[in-house]
Amino acid sequence: IIEAGFPISSPGDFEAVSAISKSVKNSIPCGLARATKKDIDACHESLKFAKRFRIHTFISTSPVHMKHKLNMTNEQVLGAIKESVTYAKKFTDDVEWSCEDGTRTDLDFMYKTIELAIKCGATTINIPDTVGYSIPEEFAKTIKLIKNNVPNIDKAIISAHCHNDLGL
């Protein structure tokens, strides 16, 4: 998998993802998209040249991000997950979903979001430590809890996005 860029973010990123999707033969290019049709459409348009490609869609799930960044409730976020993963699935069978700011997300809500994303067709679930909040032992515990509390987790690959902001 080549995480090639965020196509909607700029013309340069769109062009770079398109160029990569046109040139790769044995790798799978991936584009990043917020949980909106416009972002997912841009991903598809930039990736459609590849034999196989992945769309990686995400939405914030932590209380602080949902309140101050998205101005959305839990129910609205769940609706956006359902809509975006289902929409991305129309373009490719390879859909990755991320719970942005996952390490600051309420665990019970995280389990619901992951279960829903998989139910809607996500084949990879990414757990990001968006703000570098978690130490390795805590992050490992979170992954174990996800494995033990998300009933359909066996239908997806677990992926991680970590930072070393603490210099550990």
Predicted feature locations:
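Histidine-centered divalent metal-coordination motifs
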Residues: 159-163
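Thiamine diphosphate
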Residues: 164-168
